[in-house]
Amino acid sequence: MRQGRSRHKGGVPRRNYYRMDGDVGMAYSVGMISLGCEKNRVDAEMMMARLREAGFVLKDDAAGADAAIVNTCGFIESAKAESIEEILELAKLKKEGKIRALIVTGCMAERYREEVRRELPEADAVCGIGADGDIAEIVRRALEGEHPEVFPEKEKLPLEGKRVRSTPPYYTYLKIAEGCDNRCAYCAIPMIRGPYRSREPERIVQEAAELAASGVKELILIAQDVTRYGKDLHDGSRLPELLRRLCRIDGLRWIRLLYCYPDAITDELLDVMASEKKIVKYMDLPLQHCSHEVLRAMHRAGSRGELTELIAKIRARVPGIVLRTTMMVGFPGETADDFNELCEFAKEIKFERLGCFAFSQEEGTDAYDMEDQIPQEEKERRRDILMEQQQTIMQRWGESRVGQTVEVLVEGYDRYAGCWFGRSAADAPEVDGRVFFTAQGGKPRAGEFRKVLLTECLDCDMLGELVG
């Protein structure tokens, strides 16, 4: 797969799918391209497991398979454009006879089902996220010349199941909930994914234990909002208790939290993060903005003062924590003063990690029809200003780490740079930096934890030397 579970009662029965032409006896092959977030990645991994159980041969390169699946993202305009580009590239290969069937699924297919069917006739099958459990039957029908269109209720999206993991063996993502109830004015996720649904804690702990037994050292918890985990369960389960149970699993070394909603951060959660050694001192806390007026228009709570107090409390209760946030600029009605306040806030707080999006006008959201839409050029200008400021902040923070010895999860060797690389607790996969280090007389292995003395910060990556 580029960037899983047993069949449930009443689902499509297990069967093996073979070619019925000159290659009699050879199983059909399937390749998948999964776009977007880590939640989409987990969905793709479960689909691949179902396909493998059904007898399909999985290929890393979708372009070389009998059937190609594009697991699309429909969050913002740039993500939709990337999804369409991938579909058209595969459609070209299909026209050339290099693949037999093209299947489109995921968030964009769920959200724009009519448009996808009308504008992308090259797709042999189009299915929504609730159809993931029946993906093997959908692919079979597409390969046999049918054009299935399957859009069950969103709530039928499997919350758990066997997976063909696409990450390295030493880390993986674990989805603890699906859907969202927050209803932010700019976001289409509740329309696409449905209401918030927590997984049962026993099933999460069981899967985590199985992952640890398979060699996973770093477990990254994900959901649209991890901090609201358990609010829909009747047994009183909440995130702090789930974390305590996960920390008791042998073999796990790091547990990382992504997507923490600011108004759901509790003292109990912070105390667990501070006391449990396996929970890395890192929190992904998407704030979006600090202006009270902009946040109110976004249907989000808070103000600059309240967010400043929250961050001060987090840093006081969890010393040394690394905070990653995401900001949005160019929301309808964002004035020059609002934007300047955001820049001042980011400069004052000095987030260790910060990403920024330009507002994307998404159909069906409350923000789509709002007045005072801001021109795209101005949105991009504001984004660039904030990110340029943040680069300086992150560089200075990195320089302040020089001389520290940190634990690094080794990920590989860069033969061009002539050194090893990995991640510290301050670095989430794919979105943050890396630690590049030399190892005189030693040969670290991927998946090991080693001590590295930090010697330099270069473009927000750290350089260092192996010391243990």
Locate each region found by the language model.
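Short strand-connecting beta-turns/loops that link adjacent beta-strands
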Residues: 63, 181, 290, 415-416, ...
